[in-house]
């Protein structure tokens, strides 16, 4: 099952990246949120969700997701998320 879980996360992360490239923020929000219900440890799903909110100037929503990530991710993954969001 672990192999399928990793394959799912890899596929979802590629989809989320492409949705960002196309500025399809509504689909990005929906799919990232769904991915996080299945794989709450998916740091990249948090990244794309937060980044899309930032692109739309929805700073309160971005801050809310960042707070959720802090609660749900291990500290090292949360720190990686913070670093990636600073780029």
Residue ranges of each PLM-predicted region?
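TPR alpha-solenoid repeat register
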Residues: 11, 45, 78-79
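Canonical tetratricopeptide repeat
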Residues: 14, 48, 81-84
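Alpha-helical adaptor scaffolds
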Residues: 1-38
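Terminal, low-structured helical/coil segments at or just beyond the last alpha-helical repeat
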Residues: 63-87
């Amino acid at each position: 099952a672990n192999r399928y879980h990793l394959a799912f996360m890899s596929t979802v992360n590629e989809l989320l990246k492409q949705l960002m490239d196309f500025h399809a923020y509504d689909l990005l929000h929906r799919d990232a949120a769904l991915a996080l219900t299945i794989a709450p440890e998916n740091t990249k799903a948090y990244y794309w969700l937060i980044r899309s909110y930032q692109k739309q100037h929805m700073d309160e929503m971005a801050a809310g997701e960042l707070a959720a990530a802090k609660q749900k991710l291990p500290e090292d993954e949360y720190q990686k998320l913070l670093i990636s969001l600073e780029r």
